[in-house]
């Protein structure tokens, strides 16, 4: 509330500077406690604004809008990496983004230690096919330094008309080497659910353990998972592995729908809490456990974020699934888009996600029940192995190395489910034997 009113007062003060005295009425009628604390700072802002206009060498080239826009960008940039002030042009681009009317490289990015960092490449996209990996740092875009570049500025420079080219310089922390990639932008269409072979066939092995990897949480994620589960159950699945590694997240409603496939209707899934009570919400399961309680493992790593963490945190809290891998990214905040009257907008962090036991996700991440770390070299090799279309481009030595790459986290998950299944089968048998023993004992008395 305070930040929103402060913005209103800022606009009112600017109106006074422009000779529109009516704005001061709103300022003086604002809540008294807010006014008393904000007014001295706004006076200072007004003084600096006029000093820049009067004394800066190129001050005459700057409009009040230029200066206020710059001030608002600076103000929002002090909050967190996910909040941002968007000028009208950028807000228009964001709207195109949500409507899917844009070309891109298919890489999800975050700001990490002031570097534009790849959170995850989306499969079957230009970035993925070129070999961009999670954790790569984008240090240049078309030859221009990306150091200390804002997240939205980077997004704006990376996307564009489908068919156009962009060159990015990527530093790979695991090797310390930088490499240029010339990529052609494309309309991004991604399959959300994939099988062990990066396809959509979902075969079931002799161990009867099903496997589905969710690439991200888009509009069709829940439907595609439903199709996969139907295929696996039709083959006699007895245990299930849900792979959320390197899944950067996506839509909240899809995370809720995914959780709903493994929980009874009405079970709490996630809640949001913010400074404003309007941002508080509670989401519950809207389906039923389609697997009937069969053993379930969720694989996660540091690049599992947002909606992935909601699913993992929920099913861990409710003891419906065991989590295996590495601690997740810790991106558990809600961004609201707040349009402003001149066509600009704020992207503002307004709430945080909480698991059913009220554990905060943001900054903390989800800690696995079974910690199975992988080295940078192992993750790098596994990521290359998953890019089967690029396998032939590797040297003979690299191809031989790829054949020996094992997914230790997936192997451990399979071992754990096998153990759970053996135990589940033995318990009824032991109970049956115990019952017979008691009956014999009774007959001999």
Predicted regions and their residues:
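Bacterial N-terminal signal peptides that target proteins for export
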Residues: 2-9
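Hydrophobic membrane-insertion alpha-helices, especially the h-region
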Residues: 9-23
């Amino acid at each position: 509330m305070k930040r929103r009113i402060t913005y209103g007062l800022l606009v009112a003060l600017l109106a006074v500077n422009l000779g529109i005295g009516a704005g001061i009425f709103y300022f003086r009628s604002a809540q008294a406690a807010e006014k008393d604390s904000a007014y001295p700072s706004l006076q200072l802002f007004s003084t600096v604004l006029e000093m820049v206009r009067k004394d800066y060498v190129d001050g005459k080239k700057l409009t009040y809008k230029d200066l206020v826009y710059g001030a608002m960008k600076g103000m929002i940039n002090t909050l967190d990496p996910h909040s941002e002030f968007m000028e009208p042009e950028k807000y228009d681009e964001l709207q195109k983004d949500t409507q899917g009317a844009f070309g891109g490289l298919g890489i999800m990015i975050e700001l990490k230690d002031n570097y534009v960092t790849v959170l995850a490449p989306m499969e079957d996209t230009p970035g993925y096919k070129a070999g961009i990996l999670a954790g790569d740092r984008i240090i240049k875009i078309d030859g221009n330094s990306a150091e200390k570049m804002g997240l939205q500025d980077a997004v704006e420079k990376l996307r564009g008309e489908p068919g156009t080219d962009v060159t990015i310089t990527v530093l790979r922390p695991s090797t310390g080497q930088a490499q240029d990639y010339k990529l052609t932008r494309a309309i991004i269409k991604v399959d959300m659910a994939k099988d062990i072979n990066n396809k959509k066939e979902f075969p079931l092995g002799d161990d009867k353990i099903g496997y589905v990897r969710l690439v991200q949480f888009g509009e069709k994620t829940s439907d595609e998972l439903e199709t996969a589960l139907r295929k696996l159950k039709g083959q006699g699945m007895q245990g299930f592995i849900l792979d959320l590694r390197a899944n950067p997240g996506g839509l909240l409603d899809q995370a809720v729908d995914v959780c709903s496939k493994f929980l009874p209707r009405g079970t709490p899934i996630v809640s949001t809490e913010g400074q404003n009570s309007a941002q508080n919400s509670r989401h519950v399961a809207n389906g039923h456990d389609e697997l009937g309680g069969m053993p379930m493992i969720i694989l996660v790593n540091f690049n599992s974020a947002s909606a992935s963490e909601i699913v993992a945190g929920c099913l861990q809290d409710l003891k419906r699934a065991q989590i295996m891998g590495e601690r997740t990214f810790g991106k558990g905040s809600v961004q609201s888009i707040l349009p402003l009257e001149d066509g600009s907008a704020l992207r503002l962090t307004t709430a945080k996600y909480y698991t059913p036991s009220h554990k905060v996700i943001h900054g903390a991440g989800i800690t696995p029940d079974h910690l199975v770390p992988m080295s940078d070299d192992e993750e790098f090799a596994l990521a290359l192995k998953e890019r089967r279309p690029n396998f032939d481009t590797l040297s003979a030595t690299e191809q031989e190395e790829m054949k020996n790459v094992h997914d230790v986290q997936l192997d451990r998950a399979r071992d754990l489910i096998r153990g759970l299944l053996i135990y589940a089968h033995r318990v009824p048998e032991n109970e049956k034997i115990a019952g017979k023993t008691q009956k014999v004992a009774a007959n001999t008395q």
